[in-house]
Amino acid sequence: LWERLGQDLTLQDLMQQCRFEVLATTKLPMAIDFLNSELKHTGVLAPGMRRLSHYFTAYQAFLVEQAEEDRGRFDFRTALLVLQSEANYKASSAFDRQGLFFFQFEALCRHRLKYDAGLKSMSQDPAYDVAWQEWLLIVQKQLGLVDLADLIYGRSEEFVTYRKRHLGPDARPEYPILFGEREGKIAFANRRKEPLYLFAAMQRHLGYPPVPKREIVDQTLELIPQMQRRLERLEARMKFMEEEQRQGIDITKFFGRGGPPMVDLGENT
């Protein structure tokens, strides 16, 4: 769908084409028909995706909903790229919950989406277990009051080692541990810093796919043809002005090959 957005076709027509190209042995064509009907009646896809919860997660529906907002800067093409990268990562052998969390949360940060609704939709993703879902709701409430790196460090093996070193070997974590020792060290090193540095370090360490960014169209290649057309119009206007100052404008050259049109003045009887 993303590859065909630039073919000057409506989204309804593209959905109809995709419906005939998927495997007929599955029920996916029925889901595409349902989304196409929702698109024709309401003009948006997100409500239909929420109703098809067995095909789309709440986070995926949230991304499409943000892309369909009129005042948002998150365009639909970028949303499809994010959905594609997330689906490929979930299907790969390198998938883990830590990488999925950083990928989804980095998408919220880079595209300036709503953190509250975004984290809530992340907590409803079936890829996370109960411990992850509870922690995501905690992050939703504490984000902005507590640094993200501190929230990650508090659920890491590095923090458990720190507690045992200062409180004794019998010190046990009070909450489920979600991150390893290396992730805790990276989070501790990036405290009070720009979150993008934390994401870059985690992306290199965990190997999750980079978050697609908004494509910036280079308009410099279109400037020269535009300037050329403007110069041609200015040149034509200058010629008209010169002819008018000399002897008037000769309008006969604008006539067709048949000569000037004949005007029937009629006769008074």
Task: Give each language-model segment a name.
Residues 1-269:
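Catalytic metal-binding core of the metallo-beta-lactamase
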